[in-house]
């Protein structure tokens, strides 16, 4: 599905054309991905496979983000960080709700948000990621357009690579 969004920001307006899709793949029976593609947030949550509630964890994180924002205006960076914390708290509540210490609900979260520092500021993109899901940008300024990674994995493997 392709959608168009009009956003009033600062001294002007921005029109975004957005498309999103998720697929279970060839190995798993349950799609543990959830996504939000509605201004000001565009993100994917990848439920942790092998853990109970991976699909619920990703859906919970995305729903928490969806409930935080007005889709017609950018948000502030601080509000985005608060929304991520609330999404994390909602996922942690799933684990508590299960009532079993062996049940762990978890998800990665990666995306971008359209943010402004103050109402008259020019909006810009804020990149965020938790876990090993990545954020890329499509670079059309290169001789051959290419995907360029803009996030750094938040994982033990990345810590070992950085050491």
Q: What kind of region is each of these model predictions?
A:
Residues 1-163:
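PP2C/PPM-type serine/threonine phosphatase catalytic domain
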């Amino acid at each position: 599905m392709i959608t168009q969004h009009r956003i009033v920001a600062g001294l002007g307006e921005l029109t975004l054309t957005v498309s999103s899709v998720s697929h279970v793949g060839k190995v798993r029976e349950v799609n543990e991905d959830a996504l939000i593609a509605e201004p000001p947030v565009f993100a994917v949550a990848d439920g942790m496979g092998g853990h109970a509630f991976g699909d619920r964890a990703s859906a919970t994180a995305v729903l928490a983000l969806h409930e935080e924002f007005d889709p017609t205006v950018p948000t502030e960076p601080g509000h985005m960080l608060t929304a991520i914390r609330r999404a994390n708290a909602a996922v942690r509540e799933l684990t508590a709700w299960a009532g079993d210490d062996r049940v762990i609900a978890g998800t990665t979260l990666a995306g971008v948000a359209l943010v402004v520092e103050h109402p008259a500021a020019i909006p810009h993109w804020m990149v965020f990621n938790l876990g090993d899901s990545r954020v890329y940008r499509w670079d059309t300024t290169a001789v051959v357009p290419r995907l360029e990674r803009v996030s750094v994995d938040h994982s033990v493997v990345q810590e070992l690579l950085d050491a």
